[in-house]
């Protein structure tokens, strides 16, 4: 990750990544995944540790990252009570007539470059991992596609 200051615009590694989505989000982590065809895989993740302010759609295209404005920093600081360690701002195509402004504040930030498959593949290489929802055929039979089967006890 290249950051030229606490709240500078992030610069991503080179590559064709126009499709983006939220791959995971819980209290401790927000993961944005990017690739050129999210139906099959992605090769980049932006990982926000302990996110406490998130304003972005679940899926979007062609984000343009920029430094947050003074107004955006003030907005986040007022809402959370202190200036956050990480603030990432970008404009993206969310399918509407105009780009949407997005803002994410967190304690930590990391860029992960790794091939992540979004479907089961028996011959996946050691340099690939599976998205959280991908299950092997054996796991699907044991638990069903949507989780464990109910018992009739």
What is the predicted function of each stretch?
Residues 1-153:
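Surface-exposed, interaction-prone regions used to assemble/regulate multi-protein complexes
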């Amino acid at each position: 990750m290249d950051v030229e200051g606490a709240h500078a615009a992030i610069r991503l590694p080179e590559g064709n990544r126009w499709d983006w989505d939220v791959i995971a989000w819980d209290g401790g982590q927000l993961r944005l995944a990017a690739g050129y065809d999210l139906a099959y895989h992605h090769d980049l993740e932006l990982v926000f540790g302990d996110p406490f302010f998130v304003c972005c759609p679940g899926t979007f295209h062609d984000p343009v990252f920029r430094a947050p404005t003074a107004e955006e920093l003030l907005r986040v600081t007022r809402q959370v009570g202190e200036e956050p360690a990480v603030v990432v701002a970008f404009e993206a195509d969310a399918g509407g007539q105009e780009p949407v402004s997005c803002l994410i504040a967190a304690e930590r930030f990391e860029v992960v470059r790794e091939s992540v498959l979004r479907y089961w593949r028996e011959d996946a290489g050691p340099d690939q991992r599976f998205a959280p929802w991908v299950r092997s055929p054996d796991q699907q039979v044991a638990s069903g596609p949507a989780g464990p089967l109910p018992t009739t006890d």
